[in-house]
Amino acid sequence: MGDVPQAWKTANVTAIHKKGLKSNPSNYRPISLTCILCKILEDIIRKHVLEHLIENQLLCHEQYGFVPKRSTTLQLLNVMEEWTRVIDNGGNIDVIYCDIMKAFDQVPKCRLLRKISSYGIKGNILKWIENFLTNRTQTVVVNGVKSSE
């Protein structure tokens, strides 16, 4: 455990038409297709890590999405309830929404791994995550023809 085959770290990226003119590139959404065996192992590791985070109460109360019984829909309902309570009590609400483009891609991998380690994820699981995140490649597939990596 700890090693990830290079073939598992290669994504085949293809474009799926969303809407509008097919001649307009912005009307396509990229989809990354990866090895099914890797996806299965990813899910096993995700469940193990999430279980560790929940058991050790390492997730903050505001964490929604990717957490059992804490969907982003529930988050929206909780926020709306809080805002309604504040407004009903004569208060004001100021909201700033931020969408950080490619946020995960901008996180330094060494910092992410240090944070994961500080949460008690160690040994082979941490090695696997580190290996999984390094030397990733992708090819673009158009009409069944692959680009070079």
Regions found by a protein language model. Name each.
Residues 1-149:
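Conserved pre-catalytic core of RNA-dependent polymerases
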